[in-house]
Amino acid sequence: MKKLILTMAVSALMSTSALAANIGVSMAQFDDNFLTVLRNGMQDYAKTLDGVTLQVEDAQNDVAKQQSQIQNFIASKVDAIIVNPVDTDATAAMSKLATAAGIPLVYVNREPVNVNELPAKQAFVASNEVESGTLETKEVCKLLKGKGKIVVMMGELSNQAARQRTKDIHDVIATDECKGLTIVEEQTANWSRTQGADLMTNWLSAGLEFDAVISNNDEMAIGAIQALKAAGRKMDSVVIAGVDATQDALAAMAAGDLDVTVFQNAAGQGKGSVDAALKLAKGEKVEAKVYIPFELVTPDNLSKYQSKN
């Protein structure tokens, strides 16, 4: 069923006929495993299309730099713009710039703050973040049999995904079947493996006791694993969960270190954003929100995902 939904979501955008187009792409940062897969998905797909050129820029996690890139795309009269926002609270200004220039704009992966008021010729392609943290936390609850102490590693709080995934965690542990779970610590590690390791080291040094780590992404979860191992903690004594199902995360799961992740189809989002941009450039209609489903990954179904992302 999930495969069918995914096929429908992407195929709905794939009716674009051949179109010579120059698309400007501003990525929040290149130095991110998941966003690298997403970016590669865009570029690999564009190579299969006649006359389609992507001009891909690295915003280096700098909001001002990203806005400048968008202004440069507009000045060079690109046919469409794709943005993976550095700060999802800064997207209203980006939408205004694109609208004033009459250039289609597609946000990808990170939900813009103005997602419910996107102007004409603008769209958002991603996965529904209500699913991500919910799938992740429900599986942790199941593994802990509804009782235990958990720590939460949050992504960058300027990103809607970090805020929503964290809300998902709280919503799940408020349900009857999971109300025996208690959050004993919750801090940001900014999506970073290094910061995840540092945060976990600090918690361990403080003598914090917990049964599970619920991370907003795989990178921070892997950092937590590294710190736990360095401290001599046995990995079968703690449940570790992340989101994205990156190759590094799947390798950690195969090694018995990561217990839960959630597959986010980065390449599918990248492809979908290019299709949406091309359709909008042709003057065709695109749904304002195009969602590609998340999928729970555990050791039981790991083999299905090892060739993805």
Indicate where each model-derived feature is located.
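A residue-level marker of the well-folded mature domains of exported/periplasmic proteins
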Residues: 3-4, 13, 20-309
